[in-house]
C-alpha cells in the first residue's frame, strides 16, 4: 500500500536517471518505495479524487514515475482504477488511470459499473449504495482474477511473451 497523499510526490523530470540506474528517481519519495516493492504485489488498485474531470496531480505524478521506472514489474498483473467525485468528471478520470494499465499489458479489472463513488466526504460516499456495491463487486472480481491467474500458473500457463517494442515517431 502506497499513498501519494502521505508525502510530497515529485513530478517526473524527464531526465531518464531512474531508468538508467534501476533504483528509481534521484529524488527519494514514496514512488521509489512503491517501485522497489511493486514486483511483490499480485495486483494493484490505484485510486484518486476527481479534480477538474481528471485524476489528482499527485496520483498522475506518482503513476508517471512509477510506470516509467517500474512498469515492467507490473506487466501482466491485474489492476483497477477507483475514482471518487462530488458530482461529475468520474468517467474521464477513470479512463485516464486505466490508460496506464492498458499501455503496460495489464488486465484491467472492472465491476458492474465504472469504479466510482460519489460524495464530498467519506461519510457521504458511504451513503452511495450503488457506488459501495460497485466497490464490493470490484473486490470480488479482483480476487477471482487473481485466483484464475494462480490456477493458470499451477497448470503451466504463463503470461504471453512480449515482442520487442517497436517505437515509431509520427514525424520522421
What are these regions (language model features)?
Residues 13-15:
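Short, charged N-terminal beta->alpha structural module
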Residues 1-10:
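Single conserved hydrophobic/aromatic residue that forms the stacking wall/gate
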Amino acid at each position: 500500500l502506497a499513498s501519494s497523499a502521505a508525502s510530497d510526490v515529485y513530478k517526473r523530470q524527464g531526465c531518464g536517471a531512474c531508468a538508467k540506474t534501476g533504483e528509481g528517481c534521484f529524488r527519494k519519495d514514496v514512488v521509489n518505495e512503491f517501485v522497489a516493492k511493486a514486483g511483490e504485489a499480485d495486483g494493484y488498485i490505484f485510486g484518486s479524487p476527481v479534480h477538474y474531470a481528471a485524476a489528482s496531480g499527485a496520483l498522475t505524478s506518482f503513476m508517471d514515475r512509477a510506470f516509467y521506472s517500474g512498469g515492467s514489474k507490473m506487466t501482466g498483473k491485474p489492476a483497477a482504477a477507483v475514482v471518487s467525485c462530488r458530482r461529475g468528471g468520474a468517467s474521464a478520470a477513470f479512463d485516464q488511470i486505466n490508460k496506464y494499465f492498458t499501455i503496460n499489458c495489464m488486465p484491467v479489472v472492472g465491476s458492474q459499473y465504472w469504479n466510482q463513488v460519489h460524495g464530498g466526504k467519506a461519510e457521504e460516499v458511504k451513503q452511495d449504495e450503488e457506488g459501495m456495491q460497485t466497490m464490493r463487486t470490484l473486490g470480488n472480481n479482483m480476487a477471482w482474477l487473481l485466483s484464475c491467474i494462480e490456477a493458470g500458473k499451477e497448470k503451466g500457463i504463463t503470461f504471453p511473451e512480449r515482442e520487442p517494442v517497436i517505437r515509431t515517431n509520427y514525424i520522421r
